[in-house]
Amino acid sequence: MNSKDKYAVYWMLTPLCVLNCGYCFRDCSPSSVASELKEGDKERAVRALYNNLTVRKLTLSGGEPLFIGGVKVKEFLSLIDAIRPFKHPENPEENLRIELLTNAVLLEDDVLDKLVGVVDRITITLDALNEDTLTKIGRNYGPYKGYVERFKRRIESIHKRGFDIKLHSVITPVNYDDLLDLVRFVLSFQADCPITKWKFYQYMTYNDPSKDLIYSIDDDLYAKKCEEIATLCKGSNIELTFKDNKMMSDSMVNLTHYGKMEAYHEENGQRVRMVSRPIWEYGSMDELKRDLKVDSELFDKFHKLK
């Protein structure tokens, strides 16, 4: 590894969430929740990522990252304070860029104010406009009804504070017929609250028949919808990414909520899951890659910063 090589890491901070999206793969069993890193170890992980593994882009995800520890917002803001010393906007080579992946329901204005200067991009998940469709997915119920109206208010507040805005959507049979209306909706406010990037995922099967039966989508149908979306967005300034199952499988190296990296590789025709030691036990990214037995070129394709 060249000492100048910098990397991006996706950190699933918690399996917990305030919503219950049916396609989500998070494990909320008592043992999984109990294994979440304590506050001090989260800070330790940040230091190791920055100093030892030369990570310069960190995506904070979940579950819902604003719900780490099962506590709304408080512990997440403590982590933000721990990240702040690694922000060096005057020196792009050493600046730790932060992306927050969230459903945005906990992103009140006072929370957003505390993210200024630390978080660079806020990525919001949005899968449909239709309230019934969102309810079927698990995004529009109880105290979180009116999901789309809340989303619109949130992005106005996010844009006002100068954050870059990105969207994530998962393409499934449940929302398949609603997606073009969603795209038209987003394009309608592009002049006032510009979305810079939008990523569309193919639902990833996890060998869970109860979920796969509902959410699995044929490769050809996924490709057809991606083509329709690309056509509709032609001429806009939104950078589109379409991530199918193969691309997701190839790029799947994540930092877990219990402080270890997980990755997958092929062995004798089987997909094998590998789990590292605690992240702070590694002195370099090369050491971590060897331990996980990942294809170094493939890893660098998705995780080395250009």
Predicted regions and their residues:
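Charged phosphate-binding loop/patch that engages nucleotide di/tri-phosphates or the phosphate backbone
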Residues: 294-306
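Canonical Radical SAM [4Fe-4S] cluster-binding loop centered on the CxxxCxxC motif
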Residues: 1-42
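Residue-level recognition of short loop/turn positions
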Residues: 20, 62, 102, 257-258
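A generic fold-level signal
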Residues: 3-5, 16, 52, 93, ...
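Short, well-ordered alpha-helix to beta-strand connector turns
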Residues: 6, 21, 119, 249-251
